């Protein structure tokens, strides 16, 4: 029963890791997409150098804001990558622990089966001895 509880706890822990990792993965993908779109905008603006000369200061302010937003997204992306790596390591460690517990459970199950067989043999021997004692008791008062 204790091993079943451990396995259930393990399954709950794995689900918790998955629930944490999945949003980070989605956010990471979103950040990369956002970074790609921002880089495309920068590339398009750089390619059209004639139009860059005519951009108003309002557009320059927008570029500064976009650049700051890009930097913030990059920092967030790096943070999420580190957290994801840590979670992957924890998940790997937990998986190894779960594998070990499964092996222990398997061995314990085999051991219990062997013990059950031995108990059955001992019970059969006990019954045989009890029958023999009963037979001897029946013979001795008659003799």
Swiss-Prot record:
The gene is atg16. Residues 66-142 form a coiled coil. The keyword DNA-binding does not apply. Belongs to the ATG16 family. This is Autophagy protein 16. It is found in: Cytoplasm; Preautophagosomal structure membrane. Keywords: Autophagy, Cell cycle, Coiled coil, Cytoplasm, Meiosis, Membrane, Protein transport, Transport. GO terms for cellular component: cytoplasm; cytosol; phagophore assembly site; phagophore assembly site membrane.
């Amino acid at each position: 029963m204790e091993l079943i509880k451990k396995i259930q706890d393990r399954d709950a822990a794995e689900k918790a890791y998955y629930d944490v990792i999945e949003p980070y993965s989605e956010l990471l993908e979103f950040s990369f997409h956002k970074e790609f779109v921002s880089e495309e905008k920068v590339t398009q603006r750089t390619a059209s150098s004639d139009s860059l000369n005519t951009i108003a200061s309002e557009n320059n302010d927008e570029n500064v804001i976009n650049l700051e937003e890009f930097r913030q997204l990059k920092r967030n992306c790096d943070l999420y990558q580190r957290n994801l790596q840590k979670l992957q390591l924890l998940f790997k460690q937990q998986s190894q622990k779960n594998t070990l517990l499964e092996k222990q459970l398997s061995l314990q199950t085999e051991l219990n089966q062997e013990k059950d067989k031995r108990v059955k043999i001992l019970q059969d021997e006990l019954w045989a001895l009890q029958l023999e004692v009963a037979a001897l008791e029946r013979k001795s008062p008659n003799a």
